[in-house]
Amino acid sequence: MNKQTLKAIIFAGLFAVPLIPFLVSSSFFFPFITTKAFAWRIIVEVIFAAWVLLALLDENYRPRKSFMLYALLFFLGVVGLSTLFSVDIAKSFWSNFERMEGYISLLHLGAFFVVISSVFREVDWKRWWNTSLAASALMVVYALFQLAGVIVIRQGGARVDGTFGNATYLAVYMLIHIFITALFLYRSRKDSTMRWVYTLLILGQVVTLYYTATRGAILGLLGGLLIVALLNIRNKEDKTIRKLSAGSLAAIMLLAGGFWLMKDTNFVRESPVLSRFSSISATELQSGGRSFVWPMAIEGFKERPIFGWGQENFVYVFQKYYQAEMYRLEPWFDRAHNTYLDWLVAAGLLGVLGYLSLYIITLYLIWRTDNNFSHVEKSIITGLLAAYAFHNLFVFDHLISYILFFSLLAYVQSREENILAKNIRLPELWVKRVALPAIAILFLLQFYFWNVKPLIANIYLIEALKSIQLQEFESAGDYLAKAYGASAAGRPEIVQHTANNAIFILTSGIPLQKKNEFYAFAKSAVLKEVENHPNEAKVELLAGSFLSATGLHDESLMHLEKAKSLMPAKQLVYFELGALYINMNERLKALEVFKTAYDLAPGYQEAKIIYLIGAIYAGDRVLENKLITELSKETIASDARIRSAYSVVGR
């Protein structure tokens, strides 16, 4: 395999990367995430293997020495150590199908950075960024079709989400591309045709960003533009830019002031986008999810300050510091919804410093005097970093934003001139006869274990869920067992769906032998999951619910009590525990448990309903009448569980 062939493979893979955001397949579980992630990993592994051979053959394609490379290696090293010392190593390395992150993804990002920064020259970067901008133009068109109602918005509501299935993910994609487009607009300012092309593209990107209604990204854009304008207000290189910057500053100030004056008008209140900004208040901030999970993250950091808990282990912090008042929010958080706090929890102080160093060194490299970025280009890249950094105060990163961020880092890195090990030359024959076979074997092994097996597990899982929807329960049981055996990656989700759907399969009309086989598999898988994650409340709760549903009350009680000890403020645990006591005909114990759940947060209506049900079963008429007065007649009449309780006690 010669150098030209290797270069062709690398370039083909790199130019395929901007198309990854469009990949969505219903054949995969979490199609908006896993389709993109598996394609990304395969591409990176192929180009990295080809690059290693190319770098061995030609010293010109070896990494460039710079602070950026060393900072990235430090960051990867720290997160690697945090993975080794994490609460749950498997979670930290593999992540899950819903996120597809973990240390495995960080390794792929590092490999991508090394490859693209080593092989691309300025002309290649121009083509690659323009390919990415062309892709963003297609995404704009897709989003406009969503606005027009031609294409369905997958997450529901009015916020466009493109092919991401999440408006926030689309927002940061557009945010980054707006600044990249501005960079090329400036570079093409003397080309009237391209000037119009880039201007129209920016308008489309801004409109798309606006209709994602993502506050952090929109405010990040305004803040980033403000920084660009401030940095150019005294630009000595270009008088026109100075005037434009002054005008931009005035426009941003007028825009902010005008919105403030109009925030209580019907026009703003009736706008699905503007109303999200006018509704920002101290009350909203105090009652929202971040007001709970951010302090949790700080407490988690205090407990493990050096290397953190490991990626994907926020769940342990969440369960430990959970507050009963969080019943209003989604039941489980796996992120702090703040990138910096997420890294603080995942990799400790060293990890977050490593992450922040990537921003700092990028700024250092572009603003130092011995590079060939113009003042305007420096300010645009600075504005991009500022906008992205602000956006990340309110969200967590995802694959595509990581790819774009690491691409920017690599772009800055590629301008460095000092090449590592430039004077070391290896015989071509040795590379072909020794290095090539060794790399091929390693590539095939990791390709099989990192991609093929997880892919098979993912496909089996989605086939199982489709079979359940079609009530083909025998096939569903077989697919779940196959998914579990295919790979360790994604296994928590496979076990979760196995446990949640077990009762449907076991009470269906499939042959008894098949039921017994599935039951044996399901019980073994659930208990193995508990063994692999011994201190995770969510897993203990899952096991307790499964064992209760299958009639193993004593075993269920053990796991539910463990879940309660791990997460004493979680009402859902008490609901399951109380239901178990009712099934065990220990109704007074059930009432006591339901009372505890109710007392945790008396304003929680679901807890009040469950408490009423407990009172009905326990025959406590005084308590029953008291709780009935606290609930509306419509609530009582429409709740099948209340009617069922009255039926069971013969009333």
Language-model segments: what does each one mean?
Residues 1, 60-65, 236, 371-375, ...:
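Membrane-interfacial, low-structure loops and terminal tails that flank and connect transmembrane helices
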Residues 2, 8-27, 41-52, 72-85, ...:
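Alpha-helical transmembrane segments of multi-pass inner-membrane proteins
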Residues 23-34, 86-93, 152-163, 288-294, ...:
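Juxtamembrane membrane-water interface segments that cap and precede transmembrane helices
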Residues 24-38, 55-62:
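Short, hydrophobic transmembrane alpha-helix segments
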Residues 116, 166, 282-284, 289-333, ...:
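TM-adjacent membrane-interface loops and short helices in multi-pass inner/ER membrane proteins
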Residues 159-160, 224-225, 243, 256-302, ...:
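Flexible juxtamembrane loops connecting transmembrane helices in multi-pass membrane enzymes
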Residues 260-272, 432-474, 489, 493-497:
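Hydrophobic alpha-helical transmembrane segments in integral membrane proteins
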Residues 460-651:
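C-terminal luminal/periplasmic domains and tails of membrane-associated envelope-modifying transferases
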